[in-house]
From Swiss-Prot:
Species in which this protein is naturally found: Syntrophus aciditrophicus (strain SB)
UniProt protein name: D-aminoacyl-tRNA deacylase
Family per similarity comment: Belongs to the DTD family.
Function: An aminoacyl-tRNA editing enzyme that deacylates mischarged D-aminoacyl-tRNAs. Also deacylates mischarged glycyl-tRNA(Ala), protecting cells against glycine mischarging by AlaRS. Acts via tRNA-based rather than protein-based catalysis; rejects L-amino acids rather than detecting D-amino acids in the active site. By recycling D-aminoacyl-tRNA to D-amino acids and free tRNA molecules, this enzyme counteracts the toxicity associated with the formation of D-aminoacyl-tRNA entities in vivo and helps enforce protein L-homochirality.
The protein's Enzyme Commission number: 3.1.1.96
Any one cellular-component term (Gene Ontology): cytoplasm
One annotated GO molecular function: D-tyrosyl-tRNA(Tyr) deacylase activity
Length: 149
């Protein structure tokens, strides 16, 4: 399971020009589910995301987590994070999990996050979305439950 985590001042998800989710200060999490991922991958990644100290303290150091700042989380499914571009010019998505299983793990991630963070919102699974954000920093982190990077 892979995540791109961005520290944001705000983020908005639209589907068919309609706002379906928006957050203020917090994290935008793009989540990609890989074949073979299970609930332990989702739980590991969620623990990392929630406790990732990417928010500044009084001295300007990245020393605070999402919980510490009472920040909000927006989770967006993105199977293209599993794209393999090593051969040719067209990405291969063969390592991405099938939609039915992905939706189960995506929903699990969101449900578990909702139990620990007061404001958790999400995009619409498998929808074509327009995501707008105001990066804070910018600060962008890449996470992988297989600890590949």
């Amino acid at each position: 399971m892979r995540a791109v985590v961005q520290r944001v001042d705000k983020a908005i998800v639209k589907v068919n020009d309609r706002i379906v989710s928006d957050i203020s200060k917090g994290m935008l999490v793009f989540l990609g589910i890989e074949k073979g991922d299970d609930f332990s991958d989702a739980d590991f990644l969620l623990e990392k995301v929630i406790n990732l100290r990417i928010f500044e303290d009084e001295e300007g150091k990245m020393n605070r987590s999402l919980s510490d700042i009472s920040g909000e989380m927006l989770v967006v499914s993105q199977f293209t994070l599993l794209g393999d571009c090593r051969k040719g010019r067209r990405p291969s998505f063969t390592s991405a999990e099938d939609p039915e299983r992905s939706n189960i793990l995506y929903s699990h991630f969101i449900n578990q996050a909702s139990e620990r963070i007061p404001v958790v919102k999400s995009g619409i699974f498998q929808a074509m979305m327009k995501v707008s954000l105001v990066n804070d920093g910018p600060v962008t982190m890449l996470l992988d439950s297989k600890r590949l990077f």
